[in-house]
Design a protein with these regions (language model features):
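Short, structured surface patches at the beginning of a domain
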Residues: 1-163
Length: 163
């Protein structure tokens, strides 16, 4: 997908009007029962969400189960998704929110920029950010910074027994 051409097209239509190869990325950090239910629901939801759009073709599910979001190199499905994006197999990745994709601002920006270089946008659905939008990087930086700080606070609470 040509990002600049697509941005021009989106001035007169929505992302739902585009013919796209769409995948989703989901991640939970533990294998607790609650998180397993969450990952199952995310899987089901995104498969249905993508299938309901007649212009989109579902091309893959990338699910990292029971893996921390701090280090992307330890997330096999994330790495497979990046390789498939580079190979031109994906136009858009849908994910629940920024914290599922990356746990720090630098990784959020690094990987979304890399994906855009491959012609792939990322839609952080709950955060209402799609990297195909021209102003997305500013909003992504702000929201990623907030998410990173929340992660730091939670880590400190756990460390001191206040979680």
């Amino acid at each position: 997908m040509n990002v600049y051409r697509t941005r021009e097209i989106l001035k007169t239509c929505s992302v739902f009007d585009l013919k796209l190869k769409v995948a989703f990325y989901a991640r939970v950090s533990t294998e607790s029962e609650d998180q397993q239910v969450s990952i199952h629901h995310q899987d089901e939801y995104y498969r249905n969400f993508i299938a309901q759009n007649k212009n989109w073709v579902f091309v893959g599910a990338y699910i990292d189960n029971g893996i921390s979001g701090i280090r992307t190199e330890k997330r096999d499905e994330f790495q497979r998704m990046m390789a498939d994006a580079k190979a031109g197999k994906i136009d858009m990745i849908v994910t629940k929110e920024i914290t599922r994709f990356a746990r720090n601002t630098l990784d959020s920006i690094k990987y979304t920029r890399e994906l855009l270089m491959y012609g792939v946008c990322v839609w952080f659905q709950n955060d209402n950010i799609n990297t195909i939008d021209e102003d997305s990087e500013l909003r992504l930086t702000i929201m990623s910074g907030i998410a990173q700080d929340e992660s730091r606070k939670l880590s400190n609470r756990i460390k001191f027994g206040h979680a």
